[in-house]
């Protein structure tokens, strides 16, 4: 069948429909919610503010997302916690690029935080020829070492009963590091060094796998930061901006100092 997906598109304030823009997806896979804003706020760094640098930024739901849609929609990812939303993210860009001439479907970025960090890394590794750049923050890249109240609840356990009637449960969720050899695009991994929600070990496991696969990638470690980046969030924004501008627009003329941070 056909499943409608709902989302929001953010454009630069000086948008010109005769121009062609790279597209970035801001993602959060759920399954308890989706990263689709229903209102405006002054803190929209990852969507509206990012668009002002010359991007089309979209947030769109995916099957396996918000439970208000339906029980089937919400449960779509059960048993496949890594991959369930990736196809919808790819198809979203393909359909939008086919519909709107101002979207460059060959210059696609993806970004997310926490579950979105997990998803954005999975996307650039699962579809390495499609997603050209990713910024992945505080991602639970290995849900086998993440909180069981999240991973077990949303992925499930495999129940096995032996001949004696004894029941055992097996728990094995596909990880991002297992896909490290697939990397072709440009990946920036970001984590706080004292994240007390998603342990930095999740990101370190991906780093280890990428190094052993002889891949070039970038890392941003934010000292003293937990799951949110607090007083380093502005610095993070400009590092994310540099990454996408360099690899999707080709504009990388910035000096060592981030002069924008000195503006009032």
Model-derived regions, located:
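Serine-hydrolase catalytic core recognition
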Residues: 1-264
